[in-house]
UniProtKB/Swiss-Prot annotation:
It is found in: Secreted; Endoplasmic reticulum; Cell membrane. Induction: Increased by Angiotensin-2. It comes from Homo sapiens (Human). One of its GO terms (cellular component) is extracellular space. This is Probable oxidoreductase PXDNL. Disulfide bonds join C255-C305, C351-C398, C440-C488, C532-C580, C718-C734, C832-C842, C836-C859, C944-C953, C1160-C1217, C1258-C1284. LRR repeats lie at residues 51-72, 75-96, 99-120, 123-144, 147-168. One of its GO terms (molecular function) is metal ion binding.
Amino acid sequence: MEPRLFCWTTLFLLAGWCLPGLPCPSRCLCFKSTVRCMHLMLDHIPQVPQQTTVLDLRFNRIREIPGSAFKKLKNLNTLLLNNNHIRKISRNAFEGLENLLYLYLYKNEIHALDKQTFKGLISLEHLYIHFNQLEMLQPETFGDLLRLERLFLHNNKLSKIPAGSFSNLDSLKRLRLDSNALVCDCDLMWLGELLQGFAQHGHTQAAATCEYPRRLHGRAVASVTVEEFNCQSPRITFEPQDVEVPSGNTVYFTCRAEGNPKPEIIWIHNNHSLDLEDDTRLNVFDDGTLMIRNTRESDQGVYQCMARNSAGEAKTQSAMLRYSSLPAKPSFVIQPQDTEVLIGTSTTLECMATGHPHPLITWTRDNGLELDGSRHVATSSGLYLQNITQRDHGRFTCHANNSHGTVQAAANIIVQAPPQFTVTPKDQVVLEEHAVEWLCEADGNPPPVIVWTKTGGQLPVEGQHTVLSSGTLRIDRAAQHDQGQYECQAVSSLGVKKVSVQLTVKPKALAVFTQLPQDTSVEVGKNINISCHAQGEPQPIITWNKEGVQITESGKFHVDDEGTLTIYDAGFPDQGRYECVARNSFGLAVTNMFLTVTAIQGRQAGDDFVESSILDAVQRVDSAINSTRRHLFSQKPHTSSDLLAQFHYPRDPLIVEMARAGEIFEHTLQLIRERVKQGLTVDLEGKEFRYNDLVSPRSLSLIANLSGCTARRPLPNCSNRCFHAKYRAHDGTCNNLQQPTWGAALTAFARLLQPAYRDGIRAPRGLGLPVGSRQPLPPPRLVATVWARAAAVTPDHSYTRMLMHWGWFLEHDLDHTVPALSTARFSDGRPCSSVCTNDPPCFPMNTRHADPRGTHAPCMLFARSSPACASGRPSATVDSVYAREQINQQTAYIDGSNVYGSSERESQALRDPSVPRGLLKTGFPWPPSGKPLLPFSTGPPTECARQEQESPCFLAGDHRANEHLALAAMHTLWFREHNRMATELSALNPHWEGNTVYQEARKIVGAELQHITYSHWLPKVLGDPGTRMLRGYRGYNPNVNAGIINSFATAAFRFGHTLINPILYRLNATLGEISEGHLPFHKALFSPSRIIKEGGIDPVLRGLFGVAAKWRAPSYLLSPELTQRLFSAAYSAAVDSAATIIQRGRDHGIPPYVDFRVFCNLTSVKNFEDLQNEIKDSEIRQKLRKLYGSPGDIDLWPALMVEDLIPGTRVGPTLMCLFVTQFQRLRDGDRFWYENPGVFTPAQLTQLKQASLSRVLCDNGDSIQQVQADVFVKAEYPQDYLNCSEIPKVDLRVWQDCCADCRSRGQFRAVTQESQKKRSAQYSYPVDKDMELSHLRSRQQDKIYVGEDARNVTVLAKTKFSQDFSTFAAEIQETITALREQINKLEARLRQAGCTDVRGVPRKAEERWMKEDCTHCICESGQVTCVVEICPPAPCPSPELVKGTCCPVCRDRGMPSDSPEKR
């Protein structure tokens, strides 16, 4: 009883506790200034105290709100009238509520609102009228609600909303119009545009959906396009004509117009609308015809018809009504008036006159100025001046003239220009004590004055603030109290323009570690977190490095925002020292820790499946490879993908064996993984499987052995120091004598950043959702089609097309990824082209989005690059799972490997054995010049000879020479350059044998390639900024790995694709088009026969240096030749080069673009607007946002291509960083770099620096006689071209060996690295050595052999010297004695015909033995050669491995599956 009594007492007290002296309405609750009258069945507005601030009348039966119902409640800020029965709100119902903020009218029965309903509610912020019966609104209804932030009109019956209904609601933040019956026709288009503007600027949330028409039902109004609104602005179909009428007659002016909605016809007389109500003589018919009855003299003048609807308006030409009377001189009906007009707008000086006959109107300007006929147009109603400029300022005179007289009237055009900013300041963040300078400039008429304010007031009197006469605000030494908002104002009599900027002043703070990482250990297969935190100003970015390679986000590694490194599924490769780097714009701090990975003893889950999985993997991989070979080489290719696969398929058996072993190794792990998952009782679907706890290290080593990974080529033998001190090995080994495989062919690409695979090991980005992302990566084909546009090519104003083609030629010297050996999936052998599943090696590109080619295929063929065994590490044992790496077939160095091959086997195939002069093989001579073409390849001709009349492929150091006519021409040029060099060197040194000539010529050609690249080509690409970053040569650094970086080969160096022109120009000697014409890019592919049949190499080369390059415009990055028509000359389905590059980057685990920005010390990226410094075009950033969703997912290549070019370069900031990094490594890590002291003599180096591509063209073109000095620079023909005789040459005389009597002939000694003391037989092949040694014994006694040892001999003629003969003879005798000793040693070595194997066991000549179960070895010519046996598919379902046999055994017969009895 007591609690109930207390409650009633409390309510009573509340009811009475209102404002002193003012009554609380009966049954209402009052508390201070709040009055609540709810659930009282009220049917009227009660009287409440005047000081009320909150009035709550909800849940009553109020039906009407009368006028001035709340007039005395000046303090009311909240009025709740919802949940009543209100049907009518009188005009001025809310009069006097100037302070009302919140008005609730929802859930009533309101059908209409008067346009004065909300008049005076100037402070209202929230208005809720939803859930009513509103059927229409008036444009002025919300006109006074300037501060309104929320307007809820949903769940009414609105079908139409008049234009301009929300035009004054500048503070609006939320607008709801959904759940109405909106008809989305032309009348509602204004609302769609308004809502689209809300969405674009982001300051207002709005909702509105279409109910009608049916086709738009449920669509958001903001999403409806202009075309879908089906609007048609008025179009005049019949215009009124001039008429002359006597007094009292009736006149008809006809006007017809069409439009949707039907336009309203309005008539204008002498620039004033006709008022039909005031003059009963006037009438407008339904068809728009104007009738004037009982005409008067006042009716004469100009009539104009205007048709208007919601989509726009249209006016007819003026029609004249002339009142017929007695002859009269002219008199003005309308005179021109002085007009003030803003610059850039248009205006009309109206001038019309009457008279009889009708007067002629003409115009003149004061001061004798003529009218501008292009902008000043005389019409029947006046003078129309369009696009007003400052020159239009002045006086214009209208002349009306007839036979009875002339009248004139003049008016002034006063041109005014309000202030407009020409330079606007930007927000700045600076360190204290740094200077700040804001530029602010404006134009206008009258000229505006620049005024600066701070936080709305004057600039501080104290401090270092200075406003220059130009309007620039300068703060000399910024301090903390200087930060805040500044405003630049451009002030003139026409108005004020303002722009605000924010200054943030931060104290200096370098990065400092707040938590250091500690040495720790982790078990194999476990995850581990390593903390590293730092602070600074700005907040430093934390990155982690391992062994000099930056760690990036992937399925293997994760670095959170605070800097903690997480390593998933730790393995032995993860052991080592890690660096934590804290970097901000003022510096960096580095600390490190050591991670130890400990092994888990015992068997792993996958060990039981090793034997069966390896057998299945061998069978599946071999079967798929054999199937692919049959498909590619037993017939001509059917598709462009077949052509590409055949063209790039490895020819070298060693490459095939290495790639096969890598595929077997990976596929075995995949099979084990699948079988372990099948045996688990826990469902792991959707979770990444962990590799390092899959199988034990012992089982991994077994898999590596059985797959062939450990049977790779032996480590290079660099013991022959005499050869390796002077010449390069063809395969690039032994360049770095401490790390012999650095930069060598058939090694894994290098990395700047750790690979970004989805599972951390092998799964590419693009399979499923990216790590930490909410949406999948866009299909590469979609990305490519966004950037590919068919547009006119913009020519480069500085450079020629040779710039791109030299890069293409150079790229083939540096890298060539080993492709997939199979284009059929391993699981069931089905071709990748017939399935669209990500089943190794298939990694197809989805094309389900709209494809411009119109193909219905759901995907495009793509097969992953072949993996390197154990990431290409040279270790003989494999005890852990490494991240997938790819193999580079080429040597990394700029050494002409695309001319000479990247292996000893290739180089031998290219040399001409018939001529012992160190020449390369030649093809038949080109008839006009007699210079040879490249020889034809003896392999399968199907890539090039697709038709019987076509020639086979050319034979060159790189098979890709046949890929394009320009490449074939460049290869022809350089093979001729070698033979030219070899011929001249042989003539200068007739005592040199063939191999010495070959090696010396090869060495010179390599130096020319280096010099042209770094001195002529790179400065054009990198400009002065990049050249400074690259810095000058400082000597060889053996600690630099010159290997090609994966991201450089896969993405950065593919920048040339954006420079490819869709047309290959072919020019004659005067740079005109040849008779055979130019070629589309795709028709120049795989067509070397065009060189033979259509003019040789000169027309192609002239098209490279005689035509401007393509300018890289972000709006037209790629030609459709590359994305839609590549290889379509021969096949119906083309290949998309751009999409392939993007997919290849994901295949290779190339990290996203933002990770490389961090590596290159650019600003970090959290959202797309953070890219505005490097990608200024907002439209491009919007495209990236639409494609990727998150900046952290952007692929490297497309981002590099859309970066803004650094002025004076052809690259953006990140691409510049990658270029400089790679080319520094290529130069500094090359022991044979041409500028490295000792590689060439100073005299030779001086001559090599005379080399130029222009000279090479002159010397080796078919018949090129004129060329510009620098073929990369655009030049005008003929004035900027030089005769070839004016181009500097490399003088080879400094390579001439000097004889013993050179001093008497006045000659000088000049031989590469003292080669005059070394016998060239050491660098010979076996045939050359045998020939040289046999000659050695039969030399006549009058010859003398001088040298350091028996392997280095130079033949000198015996002569007598007139001076110092005794000393010379003593030296000769001493040398002969040493020579005999060396000859005896050589002969003893030649008599030893045996070998020594890797275990130190002596072997006899021709002896054969088994090194391992699958490895056969033989001793031949003193050298051990081992071959790994390839097993055929087993004919039984469950073959087994038996110790002592190589291939699986079928138990049912107890014999190997490949034994002859089973065939």
